[in-house]
Amino acid sequence: MKFRSVNPALALKICAVGAVQIGVMYIFYYRSFAYLKVYEVALFTIFTPFYVTLLYDALKLRFRALYLFSVAVAVLGALVIKFGAINSEFLTGFLLVQGANLCFGLGQSAYKFMLERYGFSEQKELFGYFFVGATAVTAIAAIVLGDFSKFNPSFSQGAVIVYLGTVASALGYFLWNKGACEVDSGVLAIMNNALIPAAIVVNLVFWQKDADLARLLAGSALIYISLILHKKIMKFYAVREQRI
């Protein structure tokens, strides 16, 4: 993170992006577990792609309706993989997960939009501000909502926390948001659900967790098909914009 080479207005906006995409998002996300089972939370996260494409279009002051079609196919693929019986008393939890989805989608879209708008490419100099915003929100949430008397992690739990903070979150979010700036917004939206089969494969290979392979293959195929469809949709819009 650098100070002199970064536009102060951009730095402040990236702080706000981090505060929303990680900070506020995780408040909604973890709170939802008080109302939903794990598989229900996982199921309701599949709607994030809709938020990504709609919010990015809103920031760009445009509306590419066909993007919703390819994104819907990706959502269907994720639904095939993750569908399970739903608890009848899930409305509060559902809304909390959608709040998390909205924050995560807004963060990705805003980050991509801001870097395009400012023409800033040296993301390593900027991304620290993302975590400044995220840390500010999570620190306040921990003070207000946390119970530090119960925080007594074992060595293995501490190691997991360090890994989650340095690798999964720090490196992971940097690479994800950097990638978001390299691809079309529809591809970014679809890839949010491509994480689902990837996570299941990791659990299957490394931790031998049970998985419905038929659903995994069918859902993954639909997500792949959504990418093929989206590539054709991108070409359609490119040709139309050239004519205009």
Where are these regions (language model features)?
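Transmembrane alpha-helical segments that form core, pore/gating elements
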Residues: M1, V52-T53, I86-G146, I244
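C-terminal transmembrane-helix exit sites in multi-pass transporters
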Residues: M1, Y29, T48-F69, P197-L216
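Membrane-interface helix-cap regions at the ends of transmembrane helices
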Residues: M1-P8, Q21, L54, A74-E89, ...
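Specific transmembrane alpha-helical segments of multi-pass solute transporters/efflux pumps
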Residues: K2-Y39, V80, T166-V183
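Cytoplasmic-side transmembrane-helix entry/capping segments in multi-pass membrane proteins
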Residues: L10-A16, F63-A74, F94, S121-Y129
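Hydrophobic/small/kink-forming positions within alpha-helical transmembrane segments
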Residues: G18-G23, I27, P49-L54, G105, ...
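Helix-helix packing/entry segments at the starts of transmembrane helices
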Residues: Y26, E40-F47, Y111-T135, S169-V205
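Hydrophobic transmembrane alpha-helices of multi-pass small-molecule transport proteins
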Residues: F63-F83, N193-A194, L213-M234
